[in-house]
Regions:
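Q-loop/switch helix immediately C-terminal to the Walker
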Residues: 80-92
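The feature captures the beta-strand-to-loop junction immediately N-terminal to the Walker
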Residues: 34-36
Length: 195
């Protein structure tokens, strides 16, 4: 099912942050959402994901079960190791196949096997971000929502990230909120400018 937004308006008290937005997303590919800080980009992702229902208008094709979200704040479980954070987020059963998928994804995002047993308080911001991204990539959802996915990454890790997004976006929709289009220009994203 395509993700379609019709006449979406979102207010915080008397302040309108999204005003009558209508947009039909493609079934696959990369869409970059840009705009000034505080304009409603992350709020739009929260609405698409089904985490925010306090709006007027219509959103079809989003919601829990249809999207996978890599938050800007990482949202890792503090009592789980890096590998277990990924496994727990994608599956409630820990078996060899799931462990292999999680390890392969973490390695493809530039983490080392020695990082797998580290807990969030032992990880750098970039490592936390890549674990959050691994969780989103491995969830079986037709739409991925990535909020500032390159924020904590160096050029080498941005390159690894864009390689994965390039592959995933062949049959899934990847929506990226970013302030830095330069980091993802190699993906040739469709640009949705919010003002």
């Amino acid at each position: 099912m395509s993700l379609i937004i019709r006449n979406l308006t979102k207010k915080f008290d008397d302040k309108t942050v999204i005003d009558n937005l209508s947009y039909e997303f493609p079934d696959h590919g990369v869409v970059a959402i840009t705009g000034e800080s505080g304009i409603g980009k992350t709020t739009l992702l929260r609405i698409i994901s089904g985490l925010d229902y306090n709006y007027s208008g219509n959103v079809r094709g989003g919601g829990i079960g249809h999207v996978s979200f890599a938050f800007q704040e990482y949202r890792l479980f503090p009592n789980l190791s890096a590998i277990d954070n990924v496994i727990f987020a994608i599956c409630d059963t820990k078996n060899e196949a799931v462990i292999k998928k999680a390890k392969d994804m973490l390695i493809s995002l530039g983490l080392k096997e020695s990082d797998f047993d580290l807990f969030p308080h032992e990880l750098s911001g970039g490592m936390k971000q890549r674990i959050s991204l691994a969780r989103a990539f491995l969830k079986d959802a037709p739409t991925l929502l990535l909020d500032e996915p390159t924020k904590e990454l160096d050029k080498e890790n941005i390159s690894l990230l864009t390689d994965i997004i390039q592959k995933i976006s062949k049959d899934r929709l990847v929506i990226i909120v970013t302030h830095n289009l330069e980091d993802i220009e190699c993906l040739s994203p469709t640009i949705l400018q919010i003002s």
